[in-house]
Amino acid sequence: MPNRKIPRATAKRLPVYYRYLNVLLNANKHRVSSTELSEAVQVDSATIRRDFSYFGELGKRGYGYDVEKLLNFFKGILKQDKLTSVALVGVGSLGSALMNYNFHQSTNLRISAAFDPKESLANTVKSGIPVYPVEDMKKQIKEQQIDAVILTVPGSESQAVTDQLVEAGVHGILNFTPVRLSVPKDVQVQNIDLTNELQTLIYFIESNKVTTDDED
């Protein structure tokens, strides 16, 4: 694969392509064009071809893409060819919901450990996942070789917990807190702010209403 930096927008679309390729393979479809992919995943075909071009020649002109080969390629890129364990810090309402979900639709991702400062939760098992005291976080993350963590603690605790995670050797944080975390350059943070997402959705709904009213 060419040694090129992949744009963040492209990286975020890779799981979408991977998921649909799985659907195609399960439907015994062996070949797909960028136009067909475009219609299915709602990404224009030029963008799909540009995304794929970062990884070299993945298809053939006039033929399209071999579904199984492309699926296996992205399986390796996304590390879906092996089990990946992640940790969760903060076993509150959101954390508990994520533990209950635990990526049941994926055979390659699982929450293998959770951490919470509450004594009533420490050293218990929730949804089949062991909950450890925060004091054990560094030890468990290193022993279980965990690279990625889901962060669902209160905002006031988020940076202090993040500092501990960085010390433990974590390389990626899925941040559900409203705080923008300060981390070293080699640590990736993906921010998931449900309030922002809903506000954005409401904005587009209202904007669409205004446009429709103007057309009437």
UniProtKB/Swiss-Prot annotation:
Its main location: cytoplasm. Homodimer. NAD(+) binds at G90, V91, G92, S93, L94, G95. This is Redox-sensing transcriptional repressor Rex. Modulates transcription in response to changes in cellular NADH/NAD(+) redox state. It is found in: Cytoplasm. GO terms for biological process: negative regulation of DNA-templated transcription; response to redox state. It comes from Limosilactobacillus fermentum (strain NBRC 3956 / LMG 18251). The keyword Repressor applies. Coiled coil: none annotated.
